[in-house]
UniProtKB/Swiss-Prot annotation:
Family listed: Belongs to the anion channel-forming bestrophin (TC 1.A.46) family. Calcium-sensitive chloride channel subfamily.
Pfam families per UniProt: Bestrophin
Primary localisation category: membrane
GO MF term list: chloride channel activity
Keywords, alphabetical: Cell membrane, Chloride, Chloride channel, Ion channel, Ion transport, Membrane, Transmembrane, Transmembrane helix, Transport
Gene: best-5
Official protein name in the record: Bestrophin homolog 5
């Protein structure tokens, strides 16, 4: 039951004659620990890092022939269309054209082939990809993790009472609210998950009285800043209530919140001012025009009096197909990274990031607050640290520094002089074997007993 006499309780009275219709949104009762299936990606990106644990040739070959999220998956449709168009033109040229028509076709192909260099694909694609990748990296580093804020709040906002606990939780939640509002406006998946602010409130990330307060603030611009303002005001409240000890602690938390807000501002600004449309249009037109002309210029001309007669009629343009895969794949990489807030498999999963930030942030400032393990002596106390791995599994190479090799050179020189003094001819192989044995079985006082990282 709701206590209407409680001043902290916000009661919204509605007329009895107005039917209240539930919003058409999904059930978020398990949120943030479970994303509804309808918002989960149909296909996830393929993580190939484990496949490249070693640089062996077999591993590289296996990586090249992976399908999911691969170059082949990106270009196979365009390649099939191009091969069909090329084959159709080839059949018409070989069997449907008259002799005079073949001559005109061959001259047209020769004319275009001589001028294919007018389309500087290497320069256009290289410069375009450079801009796109730099933009993508900036967006990636600006997505925002709540970890620093949560750790600073847990460390500096002290108190085990319910009031201090709620202050810590609300600071985290207010930061996540702003992140959710930003992602709602730029990420397709987040927008579908939270189509309205009421959906955000029903999910529990924003409370009903906070939604009312948020809507009461009138502004013609986006109100991403509101919940950050709440979080900073809570810091002042915590300092007034002696939950924060001094200005330094408050300023440290405020600085982390400011960094988080600045990163989200960067993401929002990049969405506001995209790369001019004419540039992606130019690159796409250049690549597709080039390979459209290749349908005619890369035909195998077989007429006896053709100026550019083909020496070997292979029927299938293998080199042009390879060129198509490389250039079209290059273009696909750029277009895949152009808008990382879409629904492609390799785009940013901002739904997961929101869930992760809320779950980890609240756990850090609440469940894990003041949960310090008992301080006991560690197992290395009073002794030197020895290698933790066994001799069988050890693959570390001990680093002694490049100048340490001078001692080894001096040792080899002394051994060589001993052999000469004994009337023996210096044997490089024997000297090398002695050097290896000395390194393996003797420990110099100047050599460390543990590898230096």
């Amino acid at each position: 039951m709701t206590n209407n006499n409680d001043p902290k309780c916000v009661v919204i009275e509605e007329p009895d004659d107005v039917p209240v219709k539930p919003p058409k949104i999904f059930d978020f009762t398990d949120w943030p620990f479970e994303i509804p299936d309808i918002f989960k990606r149909k296909e996830l990106s393929y993580n190939y890092n484990y496949d490249l644990a070693t640089s062996k040739s077999l591993m590289i070959v296996r990586m090249i022939f992976k399908w999911r999220g691969s170059l082949w998956q990106a270009v196979y449709k365009e390649l099939i269309v191009w091969i069909c168009a090329y084959s159709l033109v080839s059949v018409i040229y070989r069997f449907a054209l008259t002799r005079s028509q073949k001559d005109i076709f061959e001259r047209f192909g020769e004319y275009c082939d001589a001028r294919m260099g007018y389309l500087p694909l290497n320069f256009v694609l290289g410069f375009f990809c450079n801009i796109i990748i730099r933009r993508w990296l900036k967006l990636y580093t600006s997505l925002g993790n709540i970890d620093n804020i949560a750790l600073f709040v847990s460390a500096y906002v002290r108190g085990t009472d319910d009031r201090a606990r709620q202050i810590r939780r609300n600071i985290i939640r207010y930061c996540v609210i702003s992140q959710c509002l930003v992602f709602r406006d730029i990420h397709v998946g987040v927008r579908r998950r939270f189509p309205t602010l009421e959906a955000v409130a029903q999910a529990g990330i924003m409370l009903p009285h906070e939604l009312e307060k948020f809507n009461s603030i009138k502004s013609r611009y986006q109100k991403y800043w509101v919940s950050f303002n709440w979080a900073l005001e809570l810091l002042n409240v915590a300092k007034t209530e002696k939950s924060i000890d001094g200005d330094n602690a408050r300023n440290a938390i405020a600085q982390e919140i400011s960094k988080f807000r600045s990163a989200l501002t960067t993401v929002s600004m990049y969405d506001w001012v995209p790369i001019p449309l004419m540039y992606p249009q130019l690159v796409n037109m250049a690549v597709h025009t080039y390979f459209f002309l290749c349908i005619f210029t890369r035909q195998f001309f077989i007429s006896a009096d053709a100026h550019n007669k083909t020496e070997v009629d292979l029927y299938i343009p293998f080199m042009t197909i390879i060129e198509f895969i490389f250039y079209m794949g290059w273009l696909k990489v750029a277009m895949e990274l152009l808008n990382p807030f879409g629904e492609d498999a390799d785009d940013f999963d901002c739904n997961l990031l929101i869930d992760r930030n809320l779950a980890i942030g609240l756990t850090s400032v609440d469940d894990a607050y003041d949960q310090l393990p008992e301080v006991k002596p560690d197992v290395f106390t009073g002794g030197s640290v020895k290698p933790l791995d066994s001799d069988d599994t050890r693959s570390l190479k001990y680093h002694f520094g490049s100048a340490a090799q001078m001692e080894e050179i001096s040792y080899l020189k002394k051994e060589e002089n001993k052999m000469i003094a004994a009337g023996k001819k210096p044997n490089k192989l024997k000297l090398w074997v002695k050097s290896v044995r000395r390194k393996r079985f003797e420990t110099s006082a100047t050599q460390p007993s543990f590898p230096i990282p």
